[in-house]
Curated annotation (Swiss-Prot):
It comes from Phenylobacterium zucineum (strain HLK1). PROSITE patterns: ACONITASE_1 (PS00450), ACONITASE_2 (PS01244). Heterodimer of LeuC and LeuD. Pfam families: Aconitase (PF00330). It catalyses: (2R,3S)-3-isopropylmalate = (2S)-2-isopropylmalate. Its EC number is 4.2.1.33. Binds 1 [4Fe-4S] cluster per subunit. This is 3-isopropylmalate dehydratase large subunit. It comes from the Bacteria. Belongs to the aconitase/IPM isomerase family. LeuC type 1 subfamily. Pathway: Amino-acid biosynthesis; L-leucine biosynthesis; L-leucine from 3-methyl-2-oxobutanoate: step 2/4. HAMAP family: LeuC_type1. It is an enzyme of class 4 (lyase).
């Protein structure tokens, strides 16, 4: 009998019952926010049900919070719908005794930054949230994925979830990347390789020497974008780097419980003889700094490359999609992607708003300042830390002063311009170099044009005024 994959082991450890090819899984951690919970709590109220495990639930305010003036509190939020959602969340969590990091609390921030930062995310766990990028937590060897509002209600009521088991895929990234290439480039390269539907029906385990060399924050970036490849979740087996990241965090085990946890966590890895349903291998040395050119995360090109022609695609549907994307993005087939001028630069989101992301961007900006360069004229650039604690750390290191000296806006934490649900939005026709995870039509604002890239690449674009090769700034 073949060995088990990491996914198999986590699944088996959480099955409560099985029937007709489906299972009831126990959920270790439920993360909630203001957008996907109002109806779920209303359903509990109608049914007269309590929250089953408030202690395994954590709430934050992130999606539609403004990134300025948070100290004024929820009641001062200008947008009526956003204010109501935030007020409703505060009322619901107070009623059910759920820990809540609200606006103005230094611990608050984007849910997928806060969970790991607090040590709530741990190896071997099952983690769900009403947000598709819950896959971020897979960087710790946790089975983590998004759920819908009706499932949010079910987990609140029962601490379980009905699931059908996915297939196993392994993506190995081997070798040493070139300078200027990192986790975001890996993620975009994987999506470019398999497409946005390539992972459908799978849970992806990332492995290989280049993945092992990533920091925990880099691993979170890689797992975050798994959903853009169509997969249910992304996983990376825990190792010494994982344990070092977790040790001493507020919710991490302490004392003797830490040693017991380590013994347990070390069992969560794929066996050597485990069989994967699909396996893909990428050479890190062949991955260049990467950006998107179109309106799907699979529309990727090396920064040194050209915008593709619709005629280069193999099917009529793909050709039509590419033609539409070029029209929407205001690009011409065959033009160098570096000719695309940018109006806005956004450094933030659950993909790239952690301290290492800000350090990488600030390093590019600092070098530009040494040469007398700042944010290019006509470019609006903003940096939005992923949490209040990230913001504090960045300010302690002086990163905020670097950004502000170059002309960047330094904001308060939140999802911000990742999605058009708060005041940070693109105007129609504006082009944005963004460190977020989705470049769909209108994602950052109606008519906005989004190019996904790494924090360092986004910083380079802000200085150059157009998409630029970060290696020219190193």
């Amino acid at each position: 009998m073949p060995g088990k994959t990491l996914y198999d082991k986590i699944w088996d450890a959480h099955v409560v019952a099985e029937q007709d090819g489906e299972a009831i899984l126990y959920i270790d951690l439920h993360l909630i926010h203001e957008v996907t919970t109002p109806q779920a709590f209303a359903g509990l109220r109608v049914a007269g049900r309590p929250v089953r495990r408030p202690d395994r639930t954590l709430a934050v305010a992130d999606h539609n919070v403004p990134t300025e003036g948070q100290g004024l509190g929820i009641d001062a939020v200008a947008d009526e719908e956003a204010r109501l959602q935030l007020q409703t969340l505060a009322k619901n969590v107070a009623e059910h005794g759920i820990e809540f990091f609200s606006m103005g609390d230094v611990r608050n921030g984007i849910v997928h930054v806060v969970g790991p930062e607090q040590g709530r995310t741990q190896p071997g766990m099952t983690i769900v949230c009403g947000d598709s990028h819950t896959s971020t937590h897979g960087a710790f060897g946790a089975l983590a994925h998004g759920i819908g509002t009706s499932e949010v209600e079910h987990v609140l009521a029962t601490q379980t979830l009905r699931q059908k088991k996915a297939k196993n895929m392994r993506v190995r990234i081997e070798g040493e990347p070139a300078p200027g290439v990192g986790a975001k480039d890996f993620a975009l390269a994987v999506i470019g390789e398999i497409g946005t539907a390539g992972g459908t029906g799978y849970v992806i385990e990332y492995a290989g020497s280049a993945v092992r060399a990533l920091s925990m924050e880099g691993r979170m970036t890689l797992c975050n974008l798994t959903i853009e490849g169509g997969a249910k979740a992304g996983l990376i087996a825990p190792d010494e780097m994982t344990y070092a990241y977790l040790q001493g965090r507020p919710a991490a085990p302490k004392g003797g419980a830490w040693e017991m946890a380590l013994d347990y966590w070390k069992g969560f890895h794929s066996d050597e003889d485990a069989v994967f349903d699909r396996e893909i291998v990428l050479d890190a040395a062949k991955i260049a700094p990467t950006v998107t050119w179109g309106t799907s995360p699979e529309d990727v090109v090396a920064v040194t490359g050209l915008v593709p022609s619709p005629d280069s695609f193999g099917t009529p549907d793909k050709r039509a999609s590419a033609a539409r994307a070029l029209e929407y993005m205001g690009l011409t087939a065959g033009q160098p992607i570096t000719e695309a001028k940018v109006d806005v630069v956004f450094i933030g989101s659950c993909t790239n708003s952690r301290i290492e992301d800000l350090r990488a961007a600030a390093a590019i900006v600092a070098k530009a300042l040494e040469g007398g360069r700042k944010v290019a004229p006509g470019v609006r650039a903003m940096v939005v830390p992923g949490s209040g604690l990230v913001r504090e750390q960045a300010e302690a290191e002086g990163l905020d002063e670097v950004f502000k000296a170059a002309g960047f806006d330094w904001r308060e934490p939140g999802c911000s311009m990742c999605l058009g649900m708060n005041p940070d939005r693109l105007a129609p026709g504006e082009r944005c170099a963004s460190t977020s995870n989705r470049n769909f039509e209108g994602r950052q604002g109606r008519g906005g044009r989004t190019h996904l890239m790494s924090p360092a690449m986004a910083a380079a674009a802000a200085i150059a005024g157009h998409i630029a090769d970060v290696r020219e700034f190193l």
